[in-house]
Design a protein with these regions (language model features):
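Short, solvent-exposed amphipathic alpha-helical segments in soluble enzyme
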Residues: 14-18, 40, 192, 224-226, ...
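Walker A/P-loop
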Residues: 218
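Short, basic, helix/turn surface patches
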Residues: 46-58, 119-125, 168, 264-268, ...
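Switch/coupling sub-region of P-loop NTPases
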Residues: 202-207, 213-214, 222-340, 344-349
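N-terminal "pre-motor" subdomain/linker immediately upstream of P-loop NTPase catalytic cores
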Residues: 1-30, 38, 53-210, 215, ...
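Short secondary-structure transition/capping segments
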Residues: 33-38, 105-107, 150-152, 248-250, ...
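Short, low-order "capping/linker" segments at domain edges
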Residues: 33-50
Length: 354
């Protein structure tokens, strides 16, 4: 009650409840704190444990029937889906609107796999909770949004980008899981290849990381940035969303909602005098021309390019728009799979792409 000294109100409560009452004075902050402590559902997926022997046969749909529908139950369903994705080494999970509800689709090596459906009665609550956990506006469904979901697997903190996109059936949600970066010697054991990368990181030029979708390009790039951060250089990134915070790297997230687009970032980033820049997902001719300008200004540039294999890469770079760009690549890292990575120096690459 607002006034614990209101004797008339206290007497009325005693009479109605037939209980004795002992008034206690407390601050509003302490009351709110206790309410949150005992009643609030945490805005987190909680930790995912992978130590059980039955993990290989784990099925997230069993979580649907374990308890009554509610906010906490929805969080358990989200956690179960993420757990199954981790067990199956899946890095992309899509939630698609269908008549029966929300279809859960795992995508691995480019192949989609139907993993069941969230009943239509839970659609709204599930999408709303997933968006809230990802720092998206759950009340907005007419425009695309991009957010970030953090969750723990054993002792490692994982990040997933969460993208919502409006369709005529309702919002489609795409979730991509990114694993923490590793030191280069853990993912590229060959000393000669690491030497090529080290030389490229310490000299002006363009380091191009290639591979098929979800091949691990971002994981590799973050490992490169982590390696370069020890040099003390002014390193900057321009990304749609920062997957992990890297010590010694000035990471920048684009925000279209306030007009901070890639074009605007490219116009102003040089005022920060970066020595190394990572540009995510360069696709336009203007962006490629900007990469060339950075090279001529003695910058080291890291970017990525999608290609399914080396033949595909040669065909894509054969277009006239890429002729100048190709000559500036000082190091190419091609990711065939998580266990197969090729590294090319400038001389070898120019012969191959000629």
């Amino acid at each position: 009650m607002a006034d614990p000294l209101d004797l008339f109100a206290i007497d009325k409560i005693i009479e109605t409840a037939e209980c004795s009452i002992e008034p206690v004075i407390a601050s509003e902050a302490s009351i709110v704190k206790k309410i949150d402590e005992y009643y609030k559902v945490a805005d987190t997926v909680d930790s995912i444990t992978l130590t059980s022997d039955e993990d290989e046969e784990f099925d997230w749909t069993e979580e649907l029937h374990k308890e009554e529908a509610g906010e906490e139950h929805i969080q358990h369903v989200i956690r179960a889906i993420l757990k199954q994705a981790i067990i199956e080494d899946v890095h992309e999970v899509n939630f698609e609107q269908v008549e029966e509800g929300l279809k859960v689709v795992f995508k691995k090596n480019g192949e989609p796999s139907d993993k069941g459906t969230i009943p239509a009665i839970l659609n709204s609550a599930f999408v709303s909770k997933l968006k809230t956990l990802s720092n998206l506006d759950a009340t907005v469904c007419e425009i695309p949004q991009l957010g970030k979901l953090c969750f723990k697997v054993e002792n490692a903190m994982l990040i997933a980008s969460v993208s919502s996109f409006p369709t005529i059936m309702g919002e489609r949600i795409s979730l991509k899981i990114y694993k923490p970066p590793k030191h280069l010697d853990k993912i590229i054991p060959d000393e000669k290849q690491r030497s090529i990368i080290s030389h490229a990181l310490n000299n002006p030029g363009i380091i191009l990381v290639c591979g098929s979708p979800l091949s691990g390009k971002t994981h590799m790039i973050y490992s490169l940035l982590m390696e370069a951060a020890t040099s003390g250089k002014n390193i900057m990134t321009i990304e749609s969303i920062a997957k992990y915070e890297l010590k010694g790297v000035n990471q920048c997230e684009l925000n279209e909602n306030v007009g901070f687009s890639m074009d605007k970032a490219l116009r102003y980033v040089e005022f920060q005098s970066p020595e190394m820049i990572y540009l995510e997902g360069v696709k336009t001719r203007d962006a490629f021309e900007f990469l060339s300008e950075l090279f001529y200004n003695d910058k080291t540039v890291i970017t990525e390019f999608m290609a399914n294999n080396m033949t595909d890469l040669r065909q894509k770079l054969a277009f006239e728009d890429f002729q100048s760009f190709k000559t500036l690549i000082t190091c190419l890292i091609f990711i065939h799979s998580k266990d197969s990575v090729e590294v090319f120096d400038k001389e070898t690459l120019q012969k191959y792409l000629a």
